[in-house]
């Protein structure tokens, strides 16, 4: 029998979740996702110094002030890693805008346009880029604007059905509901007694979103993310896409147990699901009612913002070193 990895590829598009191009290459996945946290882990490794140095030199050549230069460099780093990753896969890569813009629609639109244009100017195919936008109300409004301009968006940090519904209304290309972080919250809040893979709250959340989307023929793709175990991945076999860490992908490759399809369009259409009438007030109220979604969205933004600041600090030091050498 073939590996679980090969079996799963017949049911879902597998995506490698890492900032390391070499790991993407060995993963055998279709697409790849990354973020400031993942890029931070690999950007300072000696084997990637050339990409980092080139991004810094390019940013300095734009002749902006210190803040602008840092912005240029950070986006160029993402683009460089994204383009390197695309050499290793046939599909798309997701790159993320600065999480500190999460509550400013106009700023997110401007940054996403800049990132997309830089990606194309650096030799990338626009059709192979997904721009990651946080699932705040403001972020989802930015997505609606960007999709109309031909910029495909991946709405990330999805923890609640209402976020998914709002993203669908904005005609987002794709959403990323976070399985593991939902599970983490419930374990921290109520302990781990009584949870099995069949009652895993993260798995249940994605299953509910899948049912809603397929019931109403919503074209926005669902890419389940943030897995804590191989079992969580397998519990969502049949989801449009699954973005999985290299470690868990390796576990799937080593196991030849049979894989069963868990999510199915025909079955979803049979279920009794009522459409939700979306307004901003409904969105904000339902998010407020969901302590888990509210807390994990806020935490996710803080984590990505913090990692961006750490990456900024490292880049600032590199810029100083280059300036000192040129002095």
UniProtKB/Swiss-Prot annotation:
It catalyses: D-sedoheptulose 7-phosphate + D-glyceraldehyde 3-phosphate = D-erythrose 4-phosphate + beta-D-fructose 6-phosphate. Keywords: Cytoplasm, Pentose shunt, Schiff base, Transferase. The keyword Transferase applies. This is Transaldolase. It comes from the Bacteria. It is an enzyme of class 2 (transferase). Transaldolase is important for the balance of metabolites in the pentose-phosphate pathway. Homodimer. It holds the Pfam family TAL_FSA. The active site is at residue 132. Its EC number is 2.2.1.2. GO terms for molecular function: transaldolase activity. One of its GO terms (biological process) is pentose-phosphate shunt. The keyword Transferase applies. It is found in: Cytoplasm. Pathway: Carbohydrate degradation; pentose phosphate pathway; D-glyceraldehyde 3-phosphate and beta-D-fructose 6-phosphate from D-ribose 5-phosphate and D-xylulose 5-phosphate (non-oxidative stage): step 2/3. Coiled coil: none annotated. HAMAP family: Transaldolase_1. InterPro entries: Aldolase_TIM, TAL/FSA, Transaldolase_1, Transaldolase_AS. NCBIfam families: talAB (TIGR00874). Belongs to the transaldolase family. Type 1 subfamily. GO terms for cellular component: cytoplasm.
């Amino acid at each position: 029998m073939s590996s679980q990895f090969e079996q799963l590829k017949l049911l879902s598009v597998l995506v490698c979740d890492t900032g390391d191009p070499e790991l993407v290459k060995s993963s055998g996945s279709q697409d790849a996702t990354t973020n400031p946290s993942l890029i931070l882990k690999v950007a300072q490794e000696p084997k990637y110094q050339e990409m980092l140095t080139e991004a810094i030199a390019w940013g300095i050549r734009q002749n902006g002030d210190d803040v602008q230069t840092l912005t240029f460099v950070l986006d160029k780093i993402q683009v460089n890693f994204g383009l390197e990753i695309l050499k290793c896969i046939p599909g798309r890569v997701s790159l993320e805008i600065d999480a500190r813009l999460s509550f400013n629609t106009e700023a997110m639109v401007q940054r996403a346009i800049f990132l997309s244009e830089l990606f194309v100017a650096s030799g990338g195919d626009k059709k192979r880029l997904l721009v990651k936008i946080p699932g705040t109300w403001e972020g989802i409004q930015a997505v609606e604007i960007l999709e109309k301009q031909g910029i495909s968006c991946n709405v990330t940090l999805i923890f609640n059905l209402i976020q998914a519904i709002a993203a669908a209304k904005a005609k987002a290309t794709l959403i990323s509901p976070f399985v593991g972080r939902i599970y983490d919250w419930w374990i921290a809040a109520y302990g781990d007694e009584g949870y099995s893979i069949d009652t895993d709250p993260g798995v249940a959340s994605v299953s509910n979103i899948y049912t809603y989307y397929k019931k109403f023929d919503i074209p926005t793709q669902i890419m389940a993310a943030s897995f804590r175990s191989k079992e969580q991945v397998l519990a969502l076999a049949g989801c449009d896409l699954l973005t999985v860490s290299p470690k868990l992908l390796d576990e799937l490759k080593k196991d030849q147990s049979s894989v069963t399809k868990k999510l199915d369009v025909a079955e979803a259409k049979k279920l009794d699901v009522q459409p939700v009438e979306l307004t901003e007030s409904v969105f904000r109220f339902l998010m407020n009612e969901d302590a888990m979604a509210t807390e994990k969205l806020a935490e996710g933004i803080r984590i990505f913002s913090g990692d961006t600041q750490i990456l900024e600090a490292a880049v600032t030091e590199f810029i100083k070193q280059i300036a000192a050498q040129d002095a």
